[in-house]
Amino acid sequence: MAERIRQTIQSPYLPTAMVLSGWLLAALGYWGAWVWAAPVGLRVPGIDLAEYVKFIAEVRNGQIRLTREVFLFPLVAISLSMSLLAQRSELRLPSVLRWLINLLAIPVALAMLPPAWTPSLLTTPEFIKQTVAMAICIVAAGLSYPLLRRMPLTVSAIFVAILALASLVLPVSAFLKLRIPLDAIYGHPVDFGSGPILLTIGLLLVASSPLLLARRR
């Protein structure tokens, strides 16, 4: 058993399995329920929080101070890490899977679009920051093969790790500030869903994988 564990840890495919699992878990966590309720319609997924918090009275009147865009950070982390890592030969991914992940970075970025958006809405002060973030992610997806795969692995690894950790700490800590107003909205103590837990595990895996690759070089 100990020998099998040692072989698994030393396997060249371990970082690949970690980052693929990380992307999947982070996506499941972000699109999964952060506020749990038995009726499906009362559950709040992570992807809705950037809009949802605008309607919480304590946030609107400044009693709870948070920047709603932090709830979009996981999308930025998933999309940019896909663009930075998908085409890297060190991950030993099949060519088809490389391009699939590379292309998936674009719809992940587009998930930052506000509901019922129009081109003019995207340039308003309320949405310009997420529009810029979305544009950066889409451009990065286009540069993944010709440019980003040639970056030094250590640079990519450090950038992905910092981005993933920031995209974990900032939204989760902001979400925890909402516990009391959420209890008031629902009329009882709310149950948190599995979303934050899955996102945490996923982004920790995404942060660790390229660092492990860089350490093994």
Task: For each feature predicted by the language model, list its residue ranges.
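Compact integral membrane and secretory-pathway proteins
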Residues: 2-217
